[in-house]
Every structure is written in C-alpha cells, then in structure tokens.
Amino acid sequence: MTAIEYRDEIVIIDCGMSFPEDDMYGIDVVIPDFSYIVKNADKVKGIIVTHGHEDHIGGIPYILTQIRVPVYATRITLGLIDNKLKERGITADLRSVTAGDKIRLGSFSIETIRTTHSVADAICFYIVTPAAALFHTGDFKLDYTPIDGEPINLQKFAEIGQRGVDIMLADSTNALRPGFTKSEKFVGEKLDGIFGRAKGRIIIATF
C-alpha cells in the first residue's frame, strides 16, 4: 500500500496482504498498518489499483471496513476485488477504468497506462498534483505477446518522460537476476504440451 498526500487530500495506490513468516505463530495474514489512514479518513479521495495479485488487492476488504471510499481498477482486477468483498459480505463503490482513462480525485490528476505483468489487465499511473508529477509503474514485465493481447504501452511511457516526472516508484522484483523473463505466452504453450501428453484426468490447483 502506498499513500500519496497533498495538503488535505490522500490517494491510496494498491492495498495488499502477505502471508506470515514461519516464526509468526498464530498469524494468518499480514496486512498494512491502516492507523494513519483511519485517523485521516476524511482526506482519502479513493483507492486506485494496478493489478489483481494478492499482494496488491488482498488488504482491500480489511481497509474498507475502516473507511468508505471508491475503488478504481480495470475490469478483471475489479472482478477479483469484488469476489473478495462478497466472500466477506462487504459492499463497496467499485469503479471500472480502462487503460488510457483519466481520473480526477481532488487535486490529483491520474492517467492510467497499459502495462504487462503475469496477470492480465494491469495498469500503471501517471499522477500530477500542483506540487509534483509522479509515475507509479506497478508490477510489470516487458511482454510483447501477453495472454490478453494488450502489450505494454512503451510509447506512452516515452510521452510521460517528455512531459516530466519528479518521482518514479518502480517495481524491482527480480531486478538483480540476469537474463530476460519469457512471455506469458510461453507458459501457455508449455501447458498445451503437457496437457496434450496427458493420458488421463488433469487436475489443476490454482491460487
């Protein structure tokens, strides 16, 4: 979870959860500390979400029991969030966005940009305030053949660079590992081969 604050306004980017370490006995999940957000709930204009992985949406049901604000995400991400909320009997103001949309939340002008990740329908944000311009990449991988057919919009990245960025918050997962990450399309091709060779029933476990 990232909170951006300008004067008396706050926008939250993502709100995930993680699982406890082996020595954290009796703890089922780990969520962010919401105390500052709850204390300043009247300042929060909304939650904007980059993608649907658990470490980016898993905390949303918990924070929405503390504050009532709209949640903005793409269609697939919003569907995953909605399922989590329904499991807990929580109703929320969920608002669908598409890559390329522009959102105005108080003093925050937010542009959504198509990116690619290991989950479909991922976006990143170019956020402009009277004080500074911020680029939040979300989690991303350079994938020109993603499973949803929507490649990363590097042209828009270049345009944003020309407009000016004061702060960039970038994903760095596995950044120190050498080599390149294969396209998600490669995963599908491998699965096709495995399924084709299977002689009996196929059982798939998903998370």
Which residue ranges define each predicted feature?
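His/Asp/Glu-rich metal-coordinating catalytic cores
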Residues: 1-48, 53-207
